[in-house]
A protein has these predicted regions:
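Rossmann-fold cofactor-recognition segment
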Residues: 40-51
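Conserved NAD(P)H cofactor-binding loop of Rossmann-fold oxidoreductase domains
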Residues: 67-71
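Conserved Rossmann-fold SDR core element
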Residues: 134-144
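Catalytic loop of short-chain dehydrogenase/reductase
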Residues: 98-122, 127-136
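A short, exposed helix-loop element centered on a Lys and neighboring polar residues
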Residues: 87-88, 128
Length: 144
């Protein structure tokens, strides 16, 4: 399968990429930082997910994992708007099988960082929207 993962230079995104590579999948990674993964089936794109003009032409994805996120003044633009842009560009198509949004408990409960909580709450709501949009393709969308 073709798998697109945002935020692959470290943490959850890097772990997800390694998992899919270990299991024989082709992985495409987006991150503002340089690649930290060396594998023949991994292709890294150094880009900011807010900049749709930078999105590369890729083969149809079967899995999209929206992991890129920040906790700073760019919360809404990256965590929510960037997730929407990547999803609409790569996931809403007939070959998609699964879209996964990396959320946060703050999206459910709020936090001392209101913009971050709002961005993750928006991701939760958007997850439900995407689930309805891609259901005709027999695909699922969930937030973790």
């Amino acid at each position: 399968m073709n798998v697109l993962i945002t935020g692959t230079s470290s943490g959850i995104g890097k772990g997800c990429a390694k998992y899919f590579l270990k299991n024989g999948h082709k992985v495409y990674g987006f991150d503002r930082k340089e690649s930290t993964i060396e594998h023949p089936d991994y292709k890294h794109y150094c880009l900011d997910i807010r900049d749709k003009e930078m999105y590369p032409e890729l083969p149809p994805m079967q899995i999209v994992i929206n992991n890129a996120g920040v906790q700073n003044e760019d919360d809404i633009d990256i965590n929510l708007k960037g997730t929407i842009a990547v999803t609409e560009h790569y996931a809403v198509q007939p070959e998609i099988r699964s879209v996964i949004m990396i959320g946060s408990a703050s999206g459910h409960t709020g936090s001392e960082f209101p913009e971050y909580a709002a961005s993750k709450g928006g991701v939760l709501s958007y997850t439900k929207n995407v689930a309805m949009i891609i259901a005709p393709y027999q695909a699922t969308c969930n937030s973790l």
